[in-house]
Amino acid sequence: MTNSKQKGARFERYVASLFRDYGYDAKRSVQYCGNTGDAADLKDIPLLHCECKHQEQFRIYDWMAQAVHDSQKSGNIPTVIFKKNNHEVLVTMRFDDFMKLYKEYECSTSFGYCMNPPEESDE
């Protein structure tokens, strides 16, 4: 495995660990064992098709095009998670997809569902 492939694999494992820190059972996809083409870099993340990139040269539109193409079969939201050396991890997605997520958040929190699920009534 070349250094750049190792760096990419390390970053994918790192991002999966970040998701696990938030309670998701994220794992790195093993793309060289038959999961190619439409496979995300990470699996078991609800709603998102994640492409992970740890590169110094940013080609964000190319990366997003890859995520959009590869997510078509699953219907998940194409998302690019990226960083460069000595910088924080960032996430990008299409604006319409962001607004769908934000609207879902807004609807769920307006009734307090995110923090406190509604109690069942005895009536």
Regions flagged by a language model, labelled:
Residues 1-123:
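Catalytic phosphate/metal-binding cores of nucleic-acid and nucleotide-processing enzymes, i.e., regions
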